[in-house]
């Protein structure tokens, strides 16, 4: 999931994949704007066929938090 997410992140901000760490913060470290972040969430929904709750997504600050949230959604999808 981390690799898949870093691939998507690189489509939205100019950064090298190697510089994206689990503890990287979307806004502060990776330079995301709110619009970039919401656009990326839409792409994640399409690629992973999941539905992201915007209220829950607002609490996601780091790449690792996003990975954990997406893994949770993937698990729920399989149930």
Model-derived regions: residue spans:
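Phosphate-binding glycine-rich loops and adjacent basic patches that engage nucleotide phosphates
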Residues: 1-7, 26-33
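Thiotemplate assembly-line natural product biosynthesis machinery
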Residues: 1-17, 76-79
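An amphipathic alpha-helix signature
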Residues: 2-6, 10, 41, 63-67, ...
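Phosphopantetheine carrier-protein modules
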Residues: 12-31, 48-59
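Two-component histidine kinase catalytic core, primarily the HATPase_c
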Residues: 36
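C-terminal structural segments of small proteins and small subunits
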Residues: 49-79
């Amino acid at each position: 999931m981390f690799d898949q997410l870093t691939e998507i992140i690189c489509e939205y901000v100019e950064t090298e994949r190697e510089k994206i760490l689990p503890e990287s913060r979307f806004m502060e470290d990776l330079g995301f704007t709110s619009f970039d972040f919401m656009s990326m969430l839409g792409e994640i929904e399409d690629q992973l066929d999941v539905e992201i709750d915007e209220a829950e997504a607002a609490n996601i600050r780091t790449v690792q938090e996003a990975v954990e949230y997406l893994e949770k959604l993937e698990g729920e999808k399989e149930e």
